[in-house]
Regions:
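A hydrophobic alpha-helical transmembrane-helix feature that marks the membrane cores
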Residues: 1-256
Length: 256
C-alpha cells in the first residue's frame, strides 16, 4: 500500500506529470507559464523568500507584544487566514505564487504572537526553539542529501500513519477539552507529556524527509515552475509545525 506525504502540498499526486497535464488543460489561457519547469535552485529561492516574509511578519507582532499593544487579533487572525490560504492552495496549486507569500505573511503574524507569549513566560525560549529547529532541519537535509536516510514506501507509510495519529489525537483532545473538564495527557510537564512532545518532534522531523523527497521528484518530473512556490510553502508549513513543537517541549522542560 502506498502512502503520500501528510502535507497536502507535497503529495505524489500534486507533483505527478498527469496532474500537471490536467492543470495545463484547465488553464488554456496560459496565465501560468507551463513552459518553464520546476528547479531545485528555484524552490530553494522561493523557500528563502517565504522564510524572510514569515520572519518579517513575526517581528511585527513580536514588537507589538513587547510594546504594550494587544496582539490577540493579528495573531489569531493570522492563524485563521493562514489556514484558509493553505486549504485554497491545496486545491489550487497553480495559485501558489500568489497564495504562498500571503500564507507566510499571515502565519508570521501568528508565529510572532505565540513566540512573544512564550518568551514572556520563559525568557530565552524562542532563541533555543529557533536554534533547535534550524539544527534539526540541517541535520535532516544532510542525512537526505547524502542518502543516509532513504525515503522508501515503508518509510512513508510509517511517517504518514504516525502523523495522522497525532493530528487525530490533537483534534479529539481539543474538542473534548472544550466541552468537558478533561485535561489531555500532553498538557502539563509530566514525563508522559514530555515524552509525547519528543515523539511529535521526531515525527515532524521525519516529515522533512518526505518534503525533500517530493520536491526532488517534482524537479525530476519537470513539473511547471509554479510548483516551486507550492513545494516551498509545504516545506515552510512543516518547519512552522516543528518550531511550535519545540516551543512546547522547551516550555515543559522549563517548568521542571
Amino acid at each position: 500500500m502506498s502512502f503520500n506525504s501528510k502535507n497536502p502540498f507535497l503529495s505524489d499526486k500534486r507533483f505527478s506529470s498527469n496532474a500537471v497535464s490536467r492543470a495545463e488543460e484547465v488553464h488554456e489561457a496560459k496565465i501560468i507559464d507551463y513552459n518553464q519547469e520546476m528547479t531545485l535552485s528555484g524552490t530553494i529561492n522561493k523557500t528563502a523568500i517565504l522564510f524572510l516574509i514569515l520572519c518579517g511578519a513575526a517581528m511585527v507582532t513580536w514588537w507589538m507584544a513587547f510594546n504594550g499593544v494587544n496582539i490577540m487579533l493579528p495573531a489569531i487572525g493570522g492563524a485563521v487566514i493562514g489556514l484558509i490560504l493553505v486549504v485554497i492552495s491545496a486545491f489550487k496549486p497553480e495559485a501558489s505564487p500568489y497564495l504562498a507569500p500571503g500564507y507566510a505573511l499571515f502565519e508570521g503574524l501568528f508565529i510572532g504572537g505565540i513566540s512573544a507569549i512564550f518568551e514572556a513566560m520563559y525568557p530565552g525560549i524562542v532563541i533555543n526553539a529557533v536554534g533547535a529547529t534550524l539544527v534539526t532541519f540541517l541535520v535532516c537535509l544532510g542525512l537526505y542529501k547524502f542518502k543516509i536516510v532513504k525515503v522508501t514506501e515503508t518509510f512513508k507509510s510509517v511517517v504518514v500513519a504516525a502523523t495522522l495519529a497525532i493530528a487525530t489525537y490533537y483534534l479529539i483532545s481539543w474538542v473534548v477539552s472544550m466541552f468537558t473538564s478533561f485535561t489531555p495527557v500532553h498538557y502539563g510537564n509530566s514525563m508522559m507529556s514530555i515524552g509525547i512532545s519528543v515523539f511529535v518532534i521526531v515525527i515532524a522531523a521525519l516529515n522533512l524527509f518526505l518534503d525533500f523527497d517530493q520536491i526532488e521528484k517534482g524537479v525530476q518530473q519537470r513539473v511547471p515552475k509554479f510548483m516551486e512556490w507550492y513545494g516551498a510553502m509545504g516545506l515552510i508549513i512543516t518547519l512552522v509545525w516543528l518550531y511550535i513543537e519545540f516551543l512546547r517541549l522547551l516550555s515543559k522542560l522549563s517548568k521542571k
